[in-house]
Amino acid sequence: MDLCRNRFPYQFHTVDRENPVAEAVAVRDGKFLEVGTVAEVMQHHCEGTKVVDLKGHTAIPGLNDSHLHLIRGGLNYNLELRWEGVPSLADALRMLKEQALRTPSPQWVRVVGGWTEFQFAERRMPTLDEINDAAPDTPVFILHLYDRALLNRAALKVVGYTKDTPNPPGGEIQRDANGNPTGMLIARPNAMILYATLAKGPKLPLEQQVNSTRQFMRELNRLGLTSAIDAGGGFQNYPEDYEVIAELHEKKQ
């Protein structure tokens, strides 16, 4: 059994209208045994009980995300380079170059959203030339919101987009004056071209998919999420892409 208490009163928010805040909680086998004052909770103290002092931090009930691409995000989490919070485009391009150097073939470098040009000091997106200079040989896929993606020359080669490739029904391949793909994919009229292109990248072996999904879930836990509804989509397949969840559940991870 675990007992959690706080040196300051009323730091547990319960979302219970009749008992909205509490000083301490007792948990046994993953379920709340008591929610109330320190005195009430400490009545459950016995040999082997783990006591956790939150030291003034606030605890809230776990959050549920009703629309999350848990499977897709988990399968690719360890493959992604994340630009959220990066202060400058120069820093982002440096990170891209470093990631490309340590990415083994045939894997790609993937920046799957989570950033905007307005976070950068330069207040602009990277150019295709800058991306090609940072990663001349390793395929790179950079998703910008849901409106476009940037691919370097190496990525265009492995996905097979050429002058003769027609635009798919769900998107547009931007081309230069000679009709050759530039590396920009435009989500017009929808984002299908972005999903379809990202799905062409190589997958991790099952063991590494399990590790990647576990890491993704721990990150969600860090942000306060304890449950989610998987929204599917994005070219993941049932049941094979859901094997990781079954394995993590079996291992209680």
Regions found by a protein language model. Give the residues of each.
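Divalent metal-binding segments
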Residues: 2-8, 13, 17-62, 66-253
